[in-house]
Amino acid sequence: MTSDSAETTPLRDSSETARWQDYFQLMKPRVMSLVVFTGLTGLLAARAPIHPVLAAIAVLCIAVGAGASGALNMWYDADIDQKMRRTRGRPVPAGKIKGEEAASLGVVLSLLSVMFLGFAVNWLAAGLLAFTIVFYAVVYTMWLKRWTAQNIVIGGLAGALPPAIGWAAATGSAPLNAWLMVAIIFFWTPPHFWALSLYVTTDYAKAGVPMLPVVKGARETRKQILLYSLILFPICLSPVLTGLGGPIYLAVSGLGGLVFLLLAWRVFASKAGDAADPRVADRALYDVTEDEKAAGAKAARNLFAFSILYLFALFAALLGEAVTGVRPLELLK
């Protein structure tokens, strides 16, 4: 082997590794991991007999379907992502992967995940997965995200469906308890994303994305965060009434829900996002001091960070109780 070939081989290997990493990032691994976790929770919370191989196939298909949605989203949103500091480093806007490659990968993985889930497990689960992919990639990405301030409210349904897919994979049905898990994620989504949008409002405004703070302002956004947090609290407690959650879940949802409400109240009472409100030309109208600006940003960041922990804890409690055989409370039975 010549010295030149010895030097180029590591470079080629490094380039190929980076290429695979770009494709992996295209599938939004953070979002995919949450989807897999909630889908697995739905599958096991059903407490139904399912062969381990079929369970693994179901979870894999959910993961691939989520990744396919992410790839399609990144393909279509490349123009928006390029304008936002938070997203301009993604593979497509950064020029690491061509848009048509991302689109092709998304379509192929979508078809494979749905068909494989249908033939190997059942068609109800496959149908729900197909609906989720289409709703996220088409209804949310191509329409809602660019046209309405309610984009993440309505579009949140796509991210909320994995527990129902998992439950359907295990049982061939999707009863009330499956949809309670969907409802938890659905009503969790607005305060979670609006808390984020309060401290990246400028990015969204620059990209022309009609997030609530951009269209209605920071004050209205803070009101909506508190409203949805108040709605979320009883919904998170409801699984203990229907035979889904046990004592561990009750403790987690109750205590965690109170902390969530406290953090939502702090955001509501703060001036988070006021200084960046793109609708107001004269910032003096808001009379926001630097200390108030920093305190508001901190309140929004704290809620955003805790919301992730809270959702994880809720589903971890359901998953843990199902795996260990902790008996649900069934307070309404």
Curated annotation (Swiss-Prot):
It holds the Pfam family UbiA. Gene3D superfamilies: UbiA prenyltransferase. Its EC number is 2.5.1.141. It is found in: Cell inner membrane. It comes from the Bacteria. One of its GO terms (cellular component) is plasma membrane. Pathway: Porphyrin-containing compound metabolism; heme O biosynthesis; heme O from protoheme: step 1/1. Its main location: membrane. The keyword Ribosomal protein does not apply. One of its GO terms (molecular function) is protoheme IX farnesyltransferase activity. Keywords: Cell inner membrane, Cell membrane, Heme biosynthesis, Membrane, Transferase, Transmembrane, Transmembrane helix. It is a multi-pass membrane protein. GO terms for biological process: heme O biosynthetic process. The chain crosses the membrane at residues 31-51, 52-72, 115-135, 152-172, 178-198, 223-243, 244-264, 303-323. HAMAP family: CyoE_CtaB. Converts heme B (protoheme IX) to heme O by substitution of the vinyl group on carbon 2 of heme B porphyrin ring with a hydroxyethyl farnesyl side group. Belongs to the UbiA prenyltransferase family. Protoheme IX farnesyltransferase subfamily. NCBIfam families: cyoE_ctaB (TIGR01473), PRK04375.1-2 (NF003349). Carbon 2 of the heme B porphyrin ring is defined according to the Fischer nomenclature. This is Protoheme IX farnesyltransferase. The lineage of its organism: Bacteria, Pseudomonadati, Pseudomonadota, Alphaproteobacteria, Caulobacterales. The gene is ctaB.
